[in-house]
UniProtKB/Swiss-Prot annotation:
Keywords: Lipoprotein, Membrane, Repeat, Vacuole. One of its GO terms (cellular component) is fungal-type vacuole membrane. This is Vacuolar protein 8. It comes from Yarrowia lipolytica (strain CLIB 122 / E 150). ARM repeats lie at residues 60-97, 98-137, 139-178, 180-219, 221-260, 264-303, 305-344, 346-386, 430-469. Gene3D superfamilies: Leucine-rich Repeat Variant (1.25.10.10). It is a lipid-anchor. Belongs to the beta-catenin family. The gene is VAC8. It is found in: Vacuole membrane. SMART domains: ARM (SM00185). One of its GO terms (molecular function) is protein-membrane adaptor activity. Functions in both vacuole inheritance and protein targeting from the cytoplasm to vacuole. GO terms for biological process: autophagosome assembly; nucleus-vacuole junction assembly. Residues 1-36 are annotated as: Disordered.
Length: 573
């Protein structure tokens, strides 16, 4: 199952980091031009005043609000100066101020920073992008920066020959990309191609920020498609072998998100033959978060049958089995979600059982209070039971039925639904029906037909119906005719009169199995129940064509119920 998830699939995000802290700001007080061996002062009067004010503010920086009118005017004066030294001083001041004071700011605060960002001087670019990256930690600022056109100069800086400038620009874009409102704009801005290129940078800081930015772009299907079109897949796959744990984590998580989409899985399958091998290896990583994302990536890939087989053939099962032993809940959840998808393929049922998963799955079912883990666990058991009588027997022998009986009445609704579905599949095994009845599962299935969840009701009824067919000993049905919760009798009456064709079909079919059981006690109980007899006769006399507003499938379903009721009605006389 792909993730919604997610997901629940781990919508992981990273924040961009500045590559290096700019030096502390020093305000140039007497810049000039060399004339006859002397430096003549060239500051305008307003610049002199701004420098003096800024020096005073910096000396008392702990008590000054640099985003208020006076300090901001002084900084802006330096920004708009024609003097490069004053511009550098302003950029460095903004970088230091924003590192320590992150808050929502207005356009007046952002305008001078964005102007500095467009400067051609690398030192100014580096400090300005660091300041903007700091401001972009705040969600409100992220939106405003983009609205004010901050992308364009950042994209240009990503292509700078200066590594420090590159790194800070990418770090800023990484932060901006964590906001949902910005992601599609980034995807359309032309930033993905340089980001993808920088993900292969020789500078690990640039590579880390670029990979994190790519990860932040994988949280919507449209943006994922833009990313794939920009050629990100082969680069992300190559980064799985990175020695940097952050790069490994970002690339693994990005690929996991990309694999949510069926079209992308096909591209991965055709172009990346070693992807599964890389991900299996990463499940043995020393980093739990890398292990977790590797398992989730395999889970998403295993939404396709070819990948389900490939993971098993690539010897992925022992690595997943090891993750089951972890005490780290997210890791166990990722592993069991992966094995659930792998278990969908009939050819994988026996290898999974032979790898020793059954005992672990049953233990996990009872040991975990995590609803998702329980759902994935019991769903895996159901998948393993789907096509083999032998597998059904091994699942029962592993204690799965006793564990379900113990837990199901108090389990969350989703877990109840999965458990009753599993019991319904197990109840199809002709050689197991007597064993299941002896284990007492009717005692929990009957009350669950009263559930307020329609799936739990239907699954429980289907399990009872399956158990009623060709079982040697019908004592359980006789003994539970009236208890618990109204017993078999009330269950049949409710479903026969429900008006739901699926429920009606289950009930009529169950009545037929009980009548054909050759157990006279059951025949007498059925014939003496006026409500059951009347309900069967009423169903048998219905118009088999259904109502005018019914769709074709609904008409077919109702027709089957009517035909089955016509077969049962004479047997109740």
């Amino acid at each position: 199952m792909a993730a919604s998830a997610a997901d629940r699939m781990g919508r992981q995000r990273m924040s961009g980091l500045s590559c290096s802290a700019p030096p502390r700001p020093t305000v140039v007080t007497n810049p000039g031009n060399k004339q006859d061996g002397n430096y003549a002062p060239v500051l305008a009067e307003d610049e002199r005043e701004a420098v003096a004010l800024l020096l005073r503010y910096l000396e008392n920086r702990g008590e000054v609000d640099f985003f208020s009118n006076g300090p901001l005017r002084a900084l802006s004066t330096l920004v708009y100066s024609d003097n490069i030294d004053l511009q550098r001083s302003a950029a460095l001041a903004f970088a230091e101020i924003t590192e320590k004071d992150i808050r929502p700011v207005n356009r007046d605060c952002l305008e001078p920073v964005l102007l500095l960002l467009q400067n051609t001087d690398p030192d100014i670019q580096r400090a300005a992008s660091a300041a903007l990256g700091n401001l972009a930690v705040n969600n409100e600022n992220k939106v405003l920066i983009v609205e004010m056109g901050g992308f364009e100069p950042l994209i240009r800086q990503m292509m700078s020959p200066n590594v420090e400038v590159q790194c800070n620009a990418v770090g800023c874009i990484t932060n901006l990309a964590t906001h949902e409102a910005n992601k599609s704009k980034i995807a359309r801005s032309g930033a993905l191609l340089p980001l993808t290129k920088l993900a292969k940078s020789k500078d690990m800081r640039v590579q880390r920020n670029a990979t994190g930015a790519l990860l932040n772009m994988t949280h919507s299907d449209q943006n994922r498609q833009e990313l794939v079109n920009a050629g990100a897949i082969p680069i992300l796959v190559s980064l799985l072998s990175s020695r940097d744990p952050d790069v490994q984590y970002y690339s693994t998580t990005a690929l996991s998100n990309i694999a949510v989409d069926e079209s992308n899985r096909k591209k991965l399958s055709s172009s990346e033959p070693r992807l599964v091998e890389h991900l299996i290896k990463l499940m043995d990583s020393g980093s739990p978060r890398v292990q977790c994302q590797a398992a989730l990536a395999l889970r998403n890939l295993a939404s396709d049958s070819d990948y389900q087989l490939e993971i098993v053939k690539a010897n992925g099962l022992p690595h997943l089995f090891n993750l089951f032993q972890s005490t780290h809940t997210p890791l166990v959840l990722a592993a069991v979600a992966c094995i659930r998808n792998i278990s969908i393929h009939p050819l994988n049922e026996t290898p999974i059982i032979e790898a020793g998963f059954l005992k672990t799955l049953v233990e996990l079912l009872g040991a975990s209070d995590n609803e998702e883990i329980q759902c994935h666990t019991i769903s895996t058991l159901r998948n393993l039971a789907a096509s083999s009588e032998r597998n059904k027997l091994e699942i029962v022998e592993a204690g799965a039925v006793q564990k379900c009986k113990e837990l199901v009445l108090d389990a969350p609704r989703l877990v109840q639904s999965e458990m009753t579905a599993c019991l319904a599949v197990l109840a199809l095994g002709d050689e197991l029906k007597g064993t299941l009845l002896e284990l007492g599962i009717a005692e929990v299935l009957i009350p669950l037909t009263l559930s307020d969840n329609i799936e739990v009701q239907g699954n429980s009824a289907a399990a009872l119906g399956n158990l009623s067919s060709k079982v040697g000993n019908y004592d359980t049905f006789v003994n539970h005719w009236n208890e618990p919760s109204g017993g078999i009798r009330e269950f049949l009456i409710r479903f026969l009169t429900s008006g739901d064709s699926t429920f009606g079909h289950i009930a009529v079919w169950t009545v037929l199995q009980l009548l054909e059981s050759k157990d006279q006690r059951l025949k007498d109980l059925l014939k003496n129940s006026n409500e059951i007899v009347d309900a069967i006769h009423q169903l048998s006399s219905m118009n088999s064509d259904g109502a005018d507003g019914d769709g074709e499938d609904m008409r077919d379903s109702k027709s089957e119920v009517v035909m089955l009721a016509k077969k049962v009605a004479p047997l109740l006389k």
